[in-house]
Amino acid sequence: MMAYLLDSKKVCHVKAIFDSIERSLGTFSFSSVFSLVLTDRGGEFRNPAALECGQENLIRTSIYYCDPMCSWQKPHCEKNHEYIRKICPKGTSFDDYSQEDITLMMSHINSSPRQSLGGMSPLKLAKLMLPSQVIDYFGLTEIPDDEIVLTPALLQK
């Protein structure tokens, strides 16, 4: 899972991130990695056609929505959201965080072994399944188990 700071929760900001990823990875790699995107019904995802179509109006992904109040439809994302809330408790302002801070947080979260993955971390599994250029692009680094921090101390300045 990746996370990005947005200027606001608008479709245009999410589209700009999708476009940037597609430009960097190429349309084929983008479509291979993100063949579908499962999301909630937040306003930033309200225009699926804008997100599904990329460079030269080619379809790059398919957007699917979870039903309202059905977090069980994307349990692995919800586990990551729990970890995010451990590091950034509800009410925490993201104004003082940089994208580098968010990427560091996601490196720690993605390095955390999961029982649902047979004891592997999401990042280890991603390294087995995705081209290295994809992992490198997102700037995620594997954190040794004994150095993983999933508390607010991770981002204290």
Region locations from a protein language model:
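Structured core elements
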Residues: A3-L5, L38, G118
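Active-site beta-loop-alpha junctions of metal-dependent nucleic acid enzymes
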Residues: M2-F28
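Acidic/histidine-rich, metal-coordinating catalytic segments
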Residues: F28-N47, D67-M69
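Short small-residue beta-strand/loop micro-motif enriched in glycine and branched aliphatics
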Residues: M1-Y4, Y65, K90
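RNase H-like two-metal-ion nuclease catalytic core shared by retroviral integrases
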Residues: T39-R41, L51, I63-I87, D95-S107
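C-terminal domain-tail junction helix/linker
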Residues: K90-K157
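Metal-centered catalytic cores of metalloenzymes
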Residues: K9-V14, S20, E82-K86, S107, ...
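Short, surface-exposed basic-aromatic patches at helix termini and helix-loop junctions that form
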Residues: A49-T61
